[in-house]
Swiss-Prot record:
Organism: Mus musculus
The protein, known as: Ran-binding protein 6
Annotated GO CC locations: cytoplasm; nucleus; synapse
Presence of keyword Oxidoreductase: no
UniProt entry keywords in alphabetical sequence: Acetylation, Cytoplasm, Nucleus, Protein transport, Repeat, Transport
PTM sites of type N-acetylalanine: 2
Residue windows of the HEAT repeats: 219-257, 361-399, 402-440, 444-483, 866-905, 908-946, 949-987
Domain of life: Eukaryota
Length: 1105
């Protein structure tokens, strides 16, 4: 179509007609016509689009569908395209747009079109408020205020709709604005004559409160609107409108404190609606959601209303009984996903969350009797619901259920024999969930009865759905079951699994049924993964059948089976090891290559993809360097998957509603009626592909070198891929391994790659919002420094890093202060304390990563980094103050330990900061703190120089006192104690003039060997070798009396795997043993005091050293 004339001039009649025809073509049923119209529309200049669309919206003769399309396009233009279009309109056109829009809203008679015009009005208003909150459309605001003061109900509706769409329209709200807003909402929410007005005002009030979620004072001011909102919730539900109820759920989730003054009323209303079977399932679920959400977001408040929770429990359980008599369930060959819209699934989830939110002390007494009654019911639906309720409350009621776990488990096991298959399946699900919730004590206590019962259920060929549930439960049980316990049942388990595999393979060939077989191969993989080399005797009976499944599963509907079986084969191969697997390796690799070739020509969401990716990684681990020949075939699709960009969109709420049924999209509400959407399908595959690339770089090194540059260019930008945490984790984890690969090509190539990585990695430490991801990024940075070595950071990098670490430490202290404030609040209780402790653990974990980064800097830069470090010194000193929590003191001491170890003798300049904390913390109640202090005292002796002599002298009595403490060797204390023993050894070795060596040595020898701390153990053995090789009389003892003790120390060192083949100390110790063997009498005296295991350990030591 022709472009319109000059700015501000009206378009010609023919141009208008062309544009109207274009709008009609945009809604034409023909795809080709629509596509052509879209291309024409995209090429129309913004000025012309704006004027044409506004004219079409106002033209009542254009037809409703055309006007509707024009309204949608204009809203989109002023929303997502505002910055490109509106500022470039001439001032007079901007003025005309605003005037015309007010007139259009004011004069529109069609209710639906008026709402669309209000949406456009709100979008424009939102974009005409700047960052400071100034409204640049005062005429629009005046129109709204005039509408509020008018007696025209239609204009009230206009004002409410705009305000609901954009609650920030008043900009910087002063007292006068708040009074206007409250008057508008109050007068409309009380309107008994117009239900639509009352509903809309309640939604607008909720949206306004949500938009001001941090303004606690406003909550009090607007609290008297709550009765009207609750009344509107009730009334609208019975008019088949759940929009206000949805708003109430949002308030419960985001601003629960607003509900405080009327919490009882809110809960009573929710309880009433939840229990009313006349309402739709969705409405009842939403009403329940209000209660459940408050249990999570306002736990202390809700615990004051347990009477209402107790009344809600029967409603929840009744909803869980709402199941269909589905004859197809028994014969289904697909494991359908849970229907989250069903009452049963929604209620089960609600009970789970309620238990976790309020805890077992509250929930278990309310549910136990109801559940027991349901389990005794003749109705299979009640028995099913009772079992699923037990499954749901386990996590939240963990502590309270443990004492009754025996009777609970025995009760559940009985239902594996229930006449109804769905009850048997529910019993399997419940056992699986308990195995998760109560692990590992559940496995240790019930291994015999649970494994036996699940195997028996799997062997029952009556129903493959039940078999599949039993096999799934067994997988979950195995995950946390000690290997030593699984071995007890291995023979029976393998026999059972193999016989079922043979039957299911025949069923696949004969009938094409696959459901139980899909789960069975996963169970076999789980068993092999758990028992590792113990699977070798059974390898030959499973592998032929597994390969046969892969060969058979070629049809489209068998792709998932094929993928899971490939995964199983790779798990089995990894379990039995390269030597055993090599007989099938070539054949298996050909099967994988065939599948890989097929995948390259298949859809992105093919279910085999994720299984293939992880299977290749396991094959790499099995084959080692032999895998390099296959890497070119694997790497291309892997990089393609890892590089895939997700579809994203910024949409108005109305557009989201139109897309809500679209597969694979998830939306986050950004407020102001805007949502950010991302198509999630493919994100998991992308994360898995990234993790596999990390794995290949780590395992193959030289074999991965040629892909290093391509992968690093892809991975570095993914440090900012905020759509999926595991993608960022993989990107961070990859960096040190990619640097190791780059090093193979020489220092210049390595330096160039580090320049590309370093800056984004540092920035990611400063900007990453997720604690778990942040810890991985910090860990990666620390490892990268160690790879690159001294001088790898320039002044700009060090300055930025210093600022970031300083901010992390300051944030750490600030968060601790805030937690102390919360402990003084009225609502503080055990549940709040648990939440605060979780927060504290996250903060401490980041503190450990700060320590890791500083460790890397100290170990690579040595004393040259100390001038930079001094900006952090006051914060580190603050960590070791006696008033700080013990983890702070532990990690503060660890940082000073690193300074002493790597920056001495210069470290002595800081001695007054850490001298007394180091000595005093030797008496701390927490072994972690004692360990850090003891290690520091040891490295003072080893690396500190003469300046530390007096401090080492002071340390010895404190170290001895810890070692001699009655409970020093308990599991909790042993690591700290062994660090004390090692520290004394270091003082004896490196600062002998600080102590009476001959007096202390006999005690030190009596404390050996060290069992738990392998690093310190090998240091003590090296010192022992020094003493023996120098024939130190105190160590050798009169008439060689100490040699039996020394021989036992050496034997224990081998048994504890302290002594390894590679360690030079092994040869020294072996020579000591051989020297003693030269005297037959002495040797017999030494070995007579050893048990068989110790003698075997000595024999093994002599054979390799």
């Amino acid at each position: 179509m022709a472009a319109a004339g000059s700015a501000g001039l009206p378009a010609t009649v023919s141009e208008k007609q062309e544009f109207y025809q274009l709008l009609k073509n945009l809604i034409n049923p023909s795809c080709m016509v629509r596509r052509q119209a879209e291309e024409v529309y995209e090429n129309i200049p913004g000025l012309c689009k704006t004027t044409f669309l506004l004219d079409a919206v106002r033209n009542r003769r254009a037809g409703y569908e055309v006007r509707q399309m024009a309204a949608a396009l204009l809203r989109r233009l002023l929303s997502s395209g505002f910055e490109e279009v509106y500022p470039n309109l001439p001032p007079e056109v901007q003025r005309d747009v605003k005037i015309e829009l007010i007139l259009a809203v004011k004069l529109e008679t069609h209710a639906s079109m008026r709402k669309k015009l209000c949406d456009i009005f709100a979008v424009l208003a939102r974009n005409l408020i700047d960052e400071s909150g100034t409204n640049h459309w005062p005429e629009g605001l005046k129109f709204l205020i005039d509408s509020i003061h008018s007696k025209n109900v239609v204009l009230w509706e206009v004002a409410l709709h705009v305000f609901w769409h954009f609650p920030g329209i008043f900009g910087n709200q002063d007292r006068h604005d708040l009074d206007i807003i409250k008057r508008l909402l109050d007068q409309c929410i009380q309107d008994q004559e117009h239900p639509a007005i009352r509903t809309l005002s309640a939604r607008a009030a909720a949206t306004f409160v949500l938009a001001n979620e941090n303004n606690i004072a406003l909550f009090k001011d607007f609290a008297d609107l709550l009765p009207g909102i609750l009344q509107a919730v009730n009334d609208s539900c019975y008019q088949d409108d759940d929009s206000v109820l949805e708003s109430l759920v949002e308030i419960a989730d985001t601003v629960p404190k607003y509900l405080g003054p009327y919490l009882e009323d809110t809960l009573q209303l929710s309880l009433k609606l939840c229990g009313d079977s006349r309402l739709s399932n969705l409405q009842r679920q939403l009403a329940l959601e209000v209660i459940v959400t408050l249990s999570e977001t306002a736990t202390p408040m809700l615990k004051k209303h347990t009477n209402i929770i107790a009344q809600a429990v029967p409603h929840i359980l009744a909803m869980m009984v709402d199941l269909q008599d589905d004859d197809d369930w028994v014969n289904a060959d697909e494991m359908e996903e849970d229907d989250f819209d069903s009452n049963a699934v929604a209620a089960e989830s609600a009970l789970d969350r309620l238990a976790c939110g309020l805890g077992g002390k509250v929930v278990l007494p309310m549910t136990k009797e109801h559940i027991m009654q349901m389990l005794q019911s003749p109705d299979w639906k009640c028995r099913h619901a009772g079992l699923m309720a037990l499954s749901a409350i386990g996590e939240g009621c963990h502590q309270q259920m443990e004492p009754i776990l025996d009777e609970t488990v025995n009760s559940v096991l009985l239902f594996l024999q229930d006449p109804h298959p769905r009850v048997r399946a529910a019993a399997c699900t419940t056992l699986g969930q308990m195995a998760t919730d109560f692990a590992p004590s559940f496995q240790k206590k019930f291994h015999e009865i649970v494994i036996t019962a699940l195997l028996r259920t799997m062997e029952n060929q009556g129903n493959q759905r039940v078999q599949s549930h039993a096999a799934s439960a067994l997988v979950i049980f195995i995950e946390d079951c000690p290997k030593s316990l699984l071995i007890l049942y291995l023979e029976n388990m393998v026999k059972s699994l193999h016989s079922i595999l043979v039957i299911k393979l025949q069923e696949l060939i004969r009938n094409g049924t696959k459901l139980a077989l899909e789960q069975l191969v996963t169970t076999i993989a789980s068993v092999a993964d758990a028992i590792e080399e113990s699977f070798i005797p059974y390898y030959d009976i499973f592998m032929p059948s597994l390969k046969h499944v892969v060969e058979l599963a070629v049809q489209k509907e068998l792709k998932l089976l094929r993928g899971k079986t490939i995964e199983c084969i790779s798990h089995v191969g990894l379990a039995v090891g390269k030597e055993k697997f090599m007989q099938d390796a070539s054949n298996v690799m050909q099967l994988l290559l065939k599948t890989q070739s097929d995948l390259n020509n298949m859809e992105d969401d093919d279910p085999q993809t994720s299984y293939m990716v992880s299977a290749w990684a396991r094959m790499c681990k099995i084959l080692g360097k032999d895998f390099e020949q296959y890497l070119p075939l694997v790497i291309e699709p892997l990089i393609k998957t890892a590089s895939a960009k997700p579809d994203v969109a910024l949409l108005d709420t109305q557009d989201v509603e139109n897309m809500s049924d679209d597969d694979g999209w998830q939306f986050v509400n950004l407020g102001d009626q805007q949502s950010f959407g991302i198509k999630t399908s493919g994100l998991e595959a992308k994360a898995t592909a990234c993790q596999m690339l990390v794995y290949y770089a780590k395992e193959l090194r030289e074999g991965f070198v040629e892909y290093t540059e391509q992968v690093v260019k892809m991975m570095v930008p993914l440090l900012k891929f905020y759509f999926h945490d595991n993608v960022r984790v993989a990107a961070a984890e990859a960096m040190p391994f990619l640097l190791e690969c780059a090093r193979i090509r020489g220092s210049e190539y390595l330096s160039q790659m580090w320049q590309f990585i370093c800056d984004p990695l540092i920035k990611a430490i400063g900007t990453e919002p997720d604690t778990d991801v942040l810890s991985e990024i910090m860990n990666s940075f620390a490892k990268s420094i160690e790879v690159m070595g001294d001088g790898c950071l320039n002044d700009e990098h060090l300055e930025e890093l210093g600022g970031i670490l300083k901010a992390k430490l300051e944030g750490h202290f600030k968060n601790q202060e805030l937690r102390q404030v919360k402990r003084q609040e009225e609502n503080y209780d055990q549940q709040v304390e648990m939440s605060l402790q979780d927060e504290d653990e996250c903060d401490v974990y980041i503190l450990t990563k700060v320590s890791d980064i500083l460790h890397s800097l100290f170990s690579t830069y040595k004393e040259k980094i100390l001038p930079w470090f001094e900006q952090l010194l006051p914060l580190i000193v603050n960590l070791i103050c006696s008033s700080r929590p013990w983890p702070d003191r532990q990690w503060g001491l660890c940082i000073f330990d690193d300074i002493i170890e790597h920056c001495s003798p210069t470290s002595f300049k800081y001695v007054e900061y850490f001298r007394w904390p180091m000595l005093l913390n030797m008496r701390d109640n927490n072994p972690e703190v004692r360990q850090a202090a003891a290690y520091g005292l040891g490295v003072m002796a080893q690396f500190g120089g003469d300046d530390y002599r007096s401090l080492c002298s002071e340390a010895v009595p404190l170290l001895v006192k810890v070692i001699k403490c009655a409970n020093s060797k308990t599991k909790k204390n042993v690591i700290a104690t062994e660090n004390c023993i090692s520290a004394i050894g270091k003082i004896l070795k490196f600062k002998p003039n600080c102590v009476n060596v001959d007096e202390v040595l006999p005690h030190w020898l009596s404390w050996l060997p060290l069992h738990e701390d392998k690093e310190e153990a090998i240091q003590t053995l090296n010192f022992l070798c020094d003493l023996i090789e120098s024939n130190h009389p105190v160590v050798i003892g009169p008439n060689n009396s100490n040699l039996p003790k020394i021989i036992s120390i050496i034997a224990e060192g081998k048994i504890n795997e302290t002594i390894s083949h590679e360690d030079p100390c092994a040869k020294r110790l072996a020579n000591v043993v051989r020297q003693i063997q030269t005297s037959e009498e002495l040797w017999l005296e030494c070995t007579s005091q050893l048990d068989d295991e110790q003698q075997e350990a000595l024999h093994e030591l002599l054979s390799f050293a």
